[in-house]
């Protein structure tokens, strides 16, 4: 990517070509110095070209050092990505696709497919380059910047998507050949992506999910939490735009992360990542409630109850996990209070309340088999529900 950036920087190209041409000019003077008819050429090279090259040598070195800084490279990739996304939603591109839909249009279908593939390939490449920088960079701040830029790119894309012509979402070879989609061997999976128009978001979620697992393995809690926080920000934007397929993809991604977080918490007795994820997942569900996504809220409450039951079983060997159940209960309680303020149907509120009450009571477990710590923990949540 550095080579690509360098080849598109006009200042670097101008200076390098000036050096090359000046050097060629000097060599020509040296070879033909005896037969040189115009001695002014030697004066021009020695007293003008050479001083200019020397004068700008050090500033150019510092310019290149600054230009190749990780933060600057991230910013360039991000801005170029935004530029392409905004071009997709521009009037010119919409008019181009609309003209191509006409039967008597001079724009051929092959040309449309080629342009679509080029745009899709560039968007995929930008995401892959940002993902590579996560591995390349050893400092936390640049990696955090990559995660934020990736999240903001998705949010801008989601806002622009209603203005993008549907023909753009056709799955081309650029998407099929991308590493994130090569595991989709069934045509049905790709056709669903095309129908839901979420190939770009799914690609981003997979990269963020991989980064999240990597941060879990490295015990980098702050960066892992940032991944989930940025997913929540994307979810709020998707809820505002009423993008249901994207919201379902987000729920799937959060559930995948929950699996990894629970696995890490039970294996290494480390519940911090699980706590952070539960907090951000609950914020996402709250944003769904704010936009009256009843079915999705019900689905998320079901998942929370399922995870609570699973954590409750793991807590027999690790008592610190009881705190996570209390966190899940408290977060769902806050969501239920918000739902009550928005005057949802009383039956729906009752269903959600039942999910909370079953959060730490698996159907296959008898209360007589529970120890005192489990019963005490259960009583605390009963008090929380009563206060709610």
Identify the residue ranges that each predicted region occupies.
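Soluble C-terminal extramembrane regulatory/interaction domains of multi-pass membrane proteins
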Residues: 66-388
